[in-house]
UniProtKB/Swiss-Prot annotation:
Cellular compartment(s): Cell inner membrane
Name recorded for this polypeptide: L-tartrate/succinate antiporter
Function: Catalyzes the uptake of tartrate in exchange for intracellular succinate. Essential for anaerobic L-tartrate fermentation.
Recorded GO MF terms: antiporter activity
Reactions accelerated catalytically: (2R,3R)-tartrate(out) + succinate(in) = (2R,3R)-tartrate(in) + succinate(out)
Organismal lineage: Bacteria, Pseudomonadati, Pseudomonadota, Gammaproteobacteria, Enterobacterales
Gene of this entry: ttdT
InterPro entries documented for this protein: CitT-rel, SLC13A/DASS
Pfam families: Na_sulph_symp (PF00939)
The organism of origin for this protein: Shigella boydii serotype 4 (strain Sb227)
Family note: Belongs to the SLC13A/DASS transporter (TC 2.A.47) family. DIT1 subfamily.
């Protein structure tokens, strides 16, 4: 992009801030709260347009608020308190997100992903599944799903998982059967495999708390607004029936709705076997990595009463360093991990300020008045449907979550009858599952869309069909199962 032609991306967030700031302060709000909301909204616009990287947008927003904290962050009553030093208080607020346990959990999970990549364990697992299940096209779809499922708990970047590990493997499969991109032969087997790649990425992103960065952002927003939270085990158990159903149903459903011409063949297993032979036997580093990952998953699921999930991740990373699975250079040079670390911490800080200034409680009361007279169940379902469908308007899961999740949480808090843990888990699942709707919804989407095997009309049609199925199943399990295990 040329700066001269993209100047509007820089000006738009500033224009939004100015417009909101000039609007008269709504009744029930203090002026500093309204000005804070103006800057917060400008940050969200910046995250959507990305004139600079998202982490930079968030850090600039925090800097503006902290420097102007007497007018944006603190009320006159707070400033008048004896001994109140706004300089120290604004600094404490600015760095608050970096001490949040959610931040360190996702950072540790990124290091797990680095271990998978460096040892080759992730690639080996995918190749083994392809070799064992690749004789039939339907089973190959299950191999793609199971590969994503195994990698998802310890790969919080669905882009790294889908576009960095799975896609480079499965893109080699269609040409083995003369199924070429942008050609009539693409439907032979390539279209089915590529659709399975993106749909499996979306499904697994919803199954585990640590499978997608916005999941952890949501929990951070939930905690800052209500002091309630969902553990790794809570998320996993709450999603369990839906997870099992989708993992088993989706490959078959894709096989029926987007049937491949070629139903079976031996070329794929032979290719996978050749690749595995080139990798050699399971090495000691892979074995150590596998042992640590199994241990981490066990503690995440069953150890919540004894050790925090973030501490599990932190300790496992330390062991990975001691066992030389990864090096210190791998940590300091992991740009993706540090990028997510900074923008996620910054967004949690900004969301905390939205709550501290009183905007969330005001917005909740406003919604409570408009929603009175409707049943909590009806309101909850309506909010989930609206949140899900608004996915069409966002090309970033991070911007989507940052913009809409605080409003969803405020709406739920406005009606005490709505079970917040259940509602937030449904919102979290909608982030991942709703990513299937468009070819721009999440990081791997453009990769699979641009593979040449998924025509535009097919992608939008399948996205709508699968998206509707996912939404219906989410609402059903959210109402019938999640309250049983979360309340």
């Amino acid at each position: 992009m040329k700066p001269s032609t993209e100047w509007w991306r820089y000006l738009a967030p500033l224009a939004v801030i100015a417009i909101i700031a000039l609007i008269p302060v709504p009744a029930g709000l203090e002026s500093h709260t309204w000005l804070y909301f103006a800057v917060f909204t400008g940050v969200i616009v910046g995250l959507i347009l990305e004139p600079v990287p998202g982490a930079v947008v968030a850090m600039v927003g925090i800097s503006i608020i902290a420097i102007l904290s007497p007018w944006l962050l603190f009320s006159p009553e707070q400033l008048a308190q004896p001994g109140f030093k706004f300089t120290a208080k604004s600094l404490s607020w600015a760095v608050f997100g970096f001490s949040n346990s959610v931040i360190w959990l996702i950072f540790a999970a990124f290091m797990f992903g680095t271990g998978y990549e460096k040892t080759g364990l992730g690639r080996r697992i995918a190749l083994i599944l392809v070799k064992k299940m690749g004789h039939r096209t339907l089973f190959l779809g299950y191999a793609v799903m199971f590969s994503e499922l195994i990698l998802a708990p310890v790969t919080p970047s669905n882009s790294a998982r889908g576009a960095g590990i799975i896609y480079p493997i499965i893109r080699n499969l269609p040409p083995l059967y003369q199924s070429q991109p942008n050609d009539s032969s693409s439907r032979s087997i390539g279209s089915y495999i590529m659709w399975m790649g993106i749909v499996a990425d979306c499904v697994t992103s919803a199954i585990f708390l640590t499978a997608m960065a916005p999941n952890l952002l949501l929990i951070g927003l939930m905690k800052s607004a209500s002091h309630a939270t969902l553990s790794w085990g809570d998320w996993f158990l709450g999603m369990l029936p839906l997870s099992i159903l989708l993992v088993l149903l989706v490959p078959w459903l894709a096989y029926v709705l987007y049937p491949p011409v070629l139903k079976s063949g031996d070329q794929v297993p032979r290719w996978a076997e050749t690749e595995l032979q080139a990798m050699g036997p399971l090495c000691s580093r892979e074995k150590r990595m596998l042992g640590l990952m199994v241990g981490a998953l066990v503690l995440w699921i069953f150890g919540g009463d004894y050790i925090d999930a973030a501490m599990v991740g932190y300790s496992v990373v330390a062991l990975m360093l001691l066992l030389r699975i990864i090096s210190w250079d791998d940590i300091v040079s992991n740009k993706a991990a540090w990028n997510v670390f900074f923008w996620l911490a910054s967004l949690i800080t900004l969301a905390t300020g939205l709550n501290n200034t009183g905007f969330i409680s005001w917005f909740g009361k406003l919604l409570a008045g408009s929603l009175s007279g409707y049943s909590p169940t009806m309101v909850m379902v309506a909010l989930i449907v609206v949140f899900y469908l608004l996915r069409y308007f966002f090309a970033s899961a991070t911007a989507y979550t940052s913009a809409l999740a605080p409003m969803m949480i405020a709406a739920a808090l406005a009606m005490p009858e709505i079970p917040l843990p259940v509602f937030c888990l449904m919102v979290g699942a909608a982030i991942g599952l709703g990513s299937i709707l468009t070819p721009y919804a999440t990081g791997p989407s453009p990769i699979y869309y641009g593979s040449g095997y998924l025509p535009t009309a097919d992608y939008w049609r399948l996205g709508a069909i699968f998206g509707l199925i996912f939404l219906v199943l989410l609402v059903i399990t959210g109402l019938l199962w999640m309250p049983v295990v979360l309340l």
